UniProtKB/Swiss-Prot annotation:
Keyword presence, Ubl conjugation: no
A GO CC annotation given for this chain: cytoplasm
Molecular function, one GO term: translation release factor activity, codon specific
Posttranslational modification: Methylated by PrmC. Methylation increases the termination efficiency of RF1.
Localization annotation: Cytoplasm
Spans annotated as Disordered: 283-309
PROSITE patterns, alphabetized: RF_PROK_I
Residues recorded as bearing N5-methylglutamine in the entry: Q235
Principal place of residence: cytoplasm
Function: Peptide chain release factor 1 directs the termination of translation in response to the peptide chain termination codons UAG and UAA.
Listed name of the protein: Peptide chain release factor 1
UniProt xrefs under HAMAP family: Rel_fac_1
């Protein structure tokens, strides 16, 4: 039996009942929206707590029936038969409740900015960056998310030297946040006549999309420069200074957007800058909170090799959790659930271990 914080569970049940009561009393629209949001957040955990409470009561009744000598023999036999099944259900519900009580990542419900950059490996690295982007596009489509291209620099032989996109939908960041790091590919390039396996890499960064309320950027802390945007072959995209470079002076973070619309470039550059600053704050807070926990699923360091895609063997290996799957073709088609769920599970296990170490 898992030792669950009963006081915390009772508080949640009491708060949920209070919200239900307040919502039934026709509050003003602003109050109703806030109550509805909190109601939605608590619904899953409260539902599981109630299920667990009912199951424990059922188990108690069955145990009493089994141990009561005055109970009909047939009823006692039925209690003996049913009690183990109810106890199994309790064990599952206790695990569910335990996970639902874990501290929430405030960014989990946010949309994400996905950045993929070709690393070592030349032309092949750019092709692999393109393959990764298509993999995430297909995964997003399967989840019902929307992917919107922000900017792209194409590779000389296809793929991308760099591609940035926003991914919007329910639970986007919670699913994609463990994708940050170096992804390595081992395969025979199409241009390789000798059939030799080449190794190349691409770096993935997944940032929670930040809003003004999440991170403050003061006007005096940024410098905005405009320049001519150039296209393929160095040709000017247009005759105006449309490219925008925004530098965040305190951190030195620089963002460049070079599409045709200067207004759009500025808005998108600020969007990316805000996300990077917010992510930097999150990483700093996470590091201070628990170095031990970060080491479980990897540090989140963009230079950390997290996964290898071996095409000759048809396998993908996630080095952080020592998980190898022999279904590379399906993974590249966006079948990422097994990888993503395993990473989330490992993270939850680490959180539980950390909570268990607290006095």
């Amino acid at each position: 039996m898992i030792a669950l914080p009963q006081d915390r569970m009772d508080q949640l049940l009491k708060r949920f009942s209070m919200i239900e009561s307040q919502m039934a009393n026709n509050p003003d629209s602003d109050t109703y929206v806030k109550l509805a949001s909190e109601y939605s957040e608590l619904q899953d955990v409260v539902g599981k707590i109630r299920e667990l409470s009912d199951a424990r009561m059922e188990a108690s009744d069955l145990a009493a029936m089994r141990d009561d000598a005055s109970t009909d023999a047939e009823m006692r036999a039925l209690a003996v038969e049913e009690l183990p099944e109810v106890e199994k259900r309790i064990a599952v519900l206790e695990q569910d409740v335990q996970i639902l009580l874990l501290p929430k990542d405030a960014a989990d419900d946010k949309n994400a900015i996905l950045e993929i950059r070709a690393g070592t490996g030349g032309l092949e690295a750019a092709l692999f960056a393109g393959d990764l982007f298509r993999m995430y596009e297909r995964y997003a489509a399967e989840k019902g998310w929307r992917v919107e291209l922000v900017s792209a620099s194409e590779g000389d032989a296809g793929g991308y030297k760099e591609i940035i996109a926003t991914v919007s939908g329910k639970g986007v960041f919670s699913k994609l946040k463990f994708e940050s790091g170096v992804h390595r590919v081992q395969r025979v390039p199409e241009t390789e006549a000798g059939g030799r396996i080449h190794t190349s890499a691409a770096t993935v960064a997944v940032l929670p999309e930040a809003e003004d309320i999440d991170i403050e950027i003061r006007n005096e802390d940024i410098r905005i420069d405009t320049m001519r945007a150039s296209g393929a072959g160095g040709q000017h995209v247009n005759t105006t200074d449309s490219a925008v470079r925004i530098t965040h002076i305190p951190t030195g973070i620089m963002v460049v957007q070079a599409e045709k619309s200067q207004h759009q470039n500025r808005a998108r550059a600020m969007q990316i800058l805000r996300a990077r600053l917010y992510d930097m704050e999150r990483q700093k807070a996470e590091s201070e909170r628990s170095q031990a926990r970060r080491s479980q699923v990897g540090s989140g360091d963009r230079s950390e090799r997290i996964r290898t895609y071996n095409f000759p063997q048809g396998r993908v290996t996630d080095h952080r959790i020592n998980l190898t799957l022999y279904k590379l073709d399906r993974v590249m088609e966006g079948d990422l659930d097994e990888l993503v769920d395993a990473l989330i599970s490992d993270h939850q296990t680490a959180l539980l271990a950390e909570l268990g170490e607290q006095p």
